[in-house]
């Protein structure tokens, strides 16, 4: 079974022999950067012209179809999502900063050095949909047709604000008293501690 390390910080996975691995198993190392540019939003149901540039920060939000609780936390799903996120990030050289998965949506803040954000989002959500449907024993679409939000973050203050918003989402929604009490994926602890999250390819 392949495995990889996902560091919830400014990260990348170096491709072996200069190539992007399809199923990577190398170590993700830390990296810092700053992105600039106007805020944008992308609706998955409408094809809108948008400018994709390298060296940009983004916040990604996507909701489940009909806001169903298909991302509800349990050990199997948490491991599944972390692995899919790590694989997609390595494939498109996206630097994952923080991800918080609620029961019917996720918020993920990333840094895109190469302008691969669209391909990353498509690949990530396809992987998560296939694996989650297999886990849940369902065949219908997982994601809402209208709910891919991709917001470019202009400066470090914007990045910090979105990190706080994403990390504290379970508390804001009144589900837990403290961030660390949320049983779902929330990589704030790894970001603050600077440690890697070990992920292993699930059977799904």
Model-predicted segments: where are they?
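Short catalytic/metal-binding and nucleic-acid-binding patches
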Residues: 1-204
